[in-house]
């Protein structure tokens, strides 16, 4: 692949370069030697080219090497060849000269710079694969291909979170899934439950009804099966309800503030939980006789048993939340009065209006939602012997299965979408097929068939596409392809929308939804917030929970509260590798009851026990980036206690390195390394750099070990050891350093030190050999300074 023409700016000063990088309005890249950048451009490593290359070479005072009484200062653009060849460096800082001299080839060293070597992009081959083939963590992706892939040259000292793992990225509620699974692995069940409750106050519910998109982001996909997060969450949710007095407690202090929540569905319940946790008095109004919203009235009991929901709501009552049933906005309630009586109001009335087909004689058709509500209320009336359900979502599946279990002889689902893109959860579709439901994908309703004033069926027409080229819902049909479908009941389940008849003029709406800020759920009316399906349209329970939580946090902050929730991830934290997750294996699966045993009221799926979910937690990879820092200078400068000058600060070299998206440093946008300061080493210090690589020229280190020792009377008086290409950032071997002090170098001491160097190692499945290299280099370095026998 050739490099295309790029815009180029030759900076005349550091200030100009920084300003261009920050304020040009373009994506930029700095270039000096170019040995790293040009390779990534040539190979198409990134999804797009930078808009502007900023050339640093014309800037004065960035080159050169100065040696004085206080030490060495190497300009950022000093080349590695200059460092390796400088006799002053070879005499006083031989470690630095050796490290620079091992980089790549002579031709590259003539161009490559000190700062470039320190600031190079990640060298992992998944990151560097041409044509941007792997969208990994370090590119803003959601997984690390090396953990279960080819990892022979990757970290043997754990991973670092450089972003949210796929499971957490795909969870609308932002639950810290890897963190609570880590607690489970450690046997800390209570801590795991509390981590879930920080982001999801009803895991017993979501563990049953959420589509669990998190599993589609699992790092095990393509290897075996994703971790069964849904089953784990469900079991932990039931554990929380069994000990609700411990996990869902009333607040220790009362704020004196009163909040009204209108709507007792998942968004309203979520807001009520977090607001009550903050110490506010919360009253939840709902138009139905019992709280729960769609959770109670549209999700069948075979998926979400009513006693589970009842225990969840009882737990909120235990916390002090007050529920007022049969109170509806526009009837018993007015927004004006609520604003007068309460400090804040959260509107979460949901979407209860059945969307219409717009066909003649549509009044003869039934509502799928009404069927589910009737069954939830205890009615058991058969809708018909031959039932056609219009719709392809999970609600339509619930309607079809419910009709079948009520005794319908034949139940068929017709939907616009093709089979592979039906909006229902795939597992739900498979269950429908298992229960004898027939599918008619890519068929839409054309007309209602009527005989003697009664429903006789539907005429269906072939749907050729559901969306237009811009992704807007605009079905297209083939009028030449139609079919007649005989049915004595047609139930429409094509989605619901909010009832906005109560909305006052001061609350703006758009496309049938109430308008609220997506960040804090605030409406245009002060003190009034809104969320859930009322604002977003039909969405998942997890998304509604997240909206309720956002609103609660915003309301609390506006009232002067300090409600704080745990983080959804531990980005930038070092993670221990879970070696138990490396072998392939099957996920834990909760058993579905036999077809003959399934009913309208009984739950289909049994819980996993706590032992099973702890075993399932062992399959979690606790995903992080395992790419190593491949700089040869980095471990040498760590040992030499160097400091890095930038345009904004001077910092110890140990603080320079980080694991981030597209970067290996902590440098801010527009911040440029200007020089490296290295103090004079201790008198008589013995320095060395050892490097293992596949080829003696060109290749980056498989392992690099930098050492600096001082001895007095044959005894170590100081020791500094650093490992390169062994971990996501350069690593000081402090255990080795501490052990060596006061000891004489010997075979025995070297052997113990070598073992200490890898004592905390966590090799991956394919790179344990790197530990032998570390051991050998550490041992060799110690024995090299021993006095001859």
Where are these regions (language model features)?
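FAD-site-proximal beta/loop scaffold in flavoenzymes
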Residues: 363-385, 468-538
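C-terminal structural segment of proteins
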Residues: 1-175, 630-789
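Glycine-rich dinucleotide-binding loop and its adjacent helix/turn
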Residues: 236-252, 311-331, 354-406, 509-524
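A conserved FAD-binding loop/helix module that cradles the flavin
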Residues: 399, 531-562
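Feature captures the FAD/FMN-dependent oxidoreductase FAD-binding
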Residues: 253, 258-260, 310-359, 447-459, ...
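Mid-to-C-terminal Rossmann-like scaffold of FAD/NAD(P)H-dependent oxidoreductases
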Residues: 430-434, 443-454, 466, 557-622
